[in-house]
Amino acid sequence: MAMTAEVKDELSRLVVTHVSCRKAEVSSLLRFAGGLHIVGGRVVVEAEVDLGSTARRLRREIFDLFTYSADVHVLSAGGLRKSSRYIVRVAKEGEALARQTGLLDLRGRPVRGLPAQVVGGSVADAEAAWRGAFLAHGSLTEPGRSSALEVSCPGPEAALALVGAARRLGISAKAREVRGTDRVVIRDGEAIGALLTRMGAQDTRLVWEERRMRREVRATANRLANFDDANLRRSARAAVAAAARVERALDILGDEVPDHLAAAGHLRVEHRQASLEELGQLADPPMTKDAVAGRIRRLLSMADRKAKETGIPDTESAVTADLLDDA
């Protein structure tokens, strides 16, 4: 089951006892999943959701809290619909339900944001508002670089109201318009986890956090492996380049090279992958790595100086692109 469906399934089974919270959830769910329609001169309230368990929960709460009966209609998958959709409809008492849930104000005008009783309610009501909004049009992506919890909103006013509800819960959310749709988005992993718990999806949070931790460990391991590989490649290329320059230096100087410099040069050529410290230990008598580096540096400098005086290619000419590609 995808993460979004897991969250919605858990929220649909959540038992809520406080009446104000139950009403806030219903109001939010109807606001974010529904619409008001005029059919035969009467107001009809509709809400379209993607899980049968959500539709059953909404129908039950509408009856328990407001004593109104709701019908549930199933739109089967097919055509552009990848999965079944469920429409909860209240026709006979639609206007009364719309007024009691805050979809209509006292003058009978549609409320664009969240109802005043939800916006000004308790922190628990803010949690319920988020629960209803997520059940209506929420989504949660798998943990990763672009993980996000977001809710599609019916308009900018509803989006801003949801951002305000998140702020009351100590969670930072952002409202933005994406391809003509207003959305509220949370990207921070800690904030996503906190909101899942606040809404009542603690079990799904644990699963999400486990996947998140596993992905972070895997990403860290990959970064370290790539770092080590890059360092090894750089070290190998540097060793090949150094040996090639030393070989060229010995060719340029011939018999003119001092014995102590020649000895250091031959060590470098014969032990291409050895570190300077290891070369020093191989020397007879042993030397420090600084002494080895100094002798090789003087050998190259002497050879480059002679190459310049005689007009022949210097030691750098031995380091070709093909040579480094083969390293």
From Swiss-Prot:
Annotated GO MF terms: DNA binding
Residue ranges of DNA binding: 275-308
Disordered, as annotated region: 306-327
Superkingdom of origin organism: Bacteria
Gene Ontology BP annotations: cell division; regulation of sporulation
InterPro entries tied to this protein: Homing_endonucl (IPR027434), Sporu_reg_WhiA_N_dom (IPR018478), Sporulation_regulator_WhiA (IPR003802), Sporulation_regulator_WhiA_C (IPR023054), WhiA_LAGLIDADG_dom (IPR039518)
Keywords attached to this entry: Cell cycle, Cell division, DNA-binding
Any Pfam family the entry gives: HTH_WhiA
Known function: Involved in cell division and chromosome segregation.
Family: Belongs to the WhiA family.
Protein name per the record: Probable cell division protein WhiA
Organism: Rhodococcus opacus (strain B4)
Gene: whiA
